[in-house]
Amino acid sequence: MERRIYSAFVALIPTHKIILVSGPKNSGKSAFIEGVFSENNLAYQKIELGEALIRQEINKLSLAELLWLANQSDHMLLCECEHLALLQEFLDEVLNGKVNASIMLTAANPPDIEEELLEALAYQGAHFYLPPPTFYEYTNETSLPIESKGIDQRLIYGNYYSLNTQKLDKQEGLNQTINNIVSANFSASNRINKSEVLLRTIQVLANHIGQPLSYNQIATIIGVDNETIERYISILCKSHVLYRLPSYSTDKKYELKKTNIFIFLDNGIRNASINNFNDLLMRMDIDALWMNWLIAERIKWNKINNVMAEYFFWRSHTRQQVDFIECNVKGMEGYKFKYNKKKPLKKPPLFQNHYPDIPVHTVNTGTYFSFLTKK
């Protein structure tokens, strides 16, 4: 499968010393880069810092030894670079001309790289985001009719695997990804004291999918303090597991304020965390799964296309709601999601009274593709 970022990535290799590809665990970042190298006959060396033994040996090296190693090939691929102890010092020397090779970095968790360098990479277009293949990318690989028939599978198993992957293989792979997320060796600035609390946080959010929650509510359910929950959720967002939608409010009457909805950036991860791979006919959370999948796909579409946007939800104390609000340079638009296209959705009159200039659209199984790919 040719990923959406392929052409832009290949174009940067001859001119950039450092390229960073970030994205969720097991999303194919290293495989993508290795595929690019292979297809373009580029010599490279790969260091898999996600492997504990390799990480231990590499982190024993001095900076001088690390620089020597980097110069043994035209290109160096540092997988899960967040685990490299001397990462910032190494990159400083790369930029100072001490390394002839180009350095390709992958990261599933936030690496300890100075903000100025991260901003420079983003400005130069050298920081790519690579999630599991999006629905759009799958349709390019197969066809829209084929992928549309598999929507139910996407709601259950997410986008990590193609439609023809066996269900048991999907479940096993997703469970392993959850284990990898919970047991991740995060950087010192993103410490996790108790992995069981991290897993419990994920499970609570999974069980309240699509529901407004405050940090205090989550902390009360789990039995820990607010600061811990806020920090753990921040790490999960930075690690591409969650996306936080804050409530939209301009202090109008009856509006819900200071709460969040947490979106899982892959439905399969959400369902694996609570071990629920039941078919849709056996579920009570179909609309929540539909909403989560659509919002996650929309956010990923914008990110891989470098579209800057902000996202919100809206609720009132009188139970009126807009599931998703997108704000970009073209303006603001609201959306309500319903899996069953035969059931009409009413637009919330309170929202329309407060914000008559923000249109509200309905997205169902008959109208979703234009929403996912809207530019």
PLM features: what roles do these ranges have?
Residues P111-G125:
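Short regulatory helix/loop adjacent to the ATP-binding pocket of P-loop NTPases
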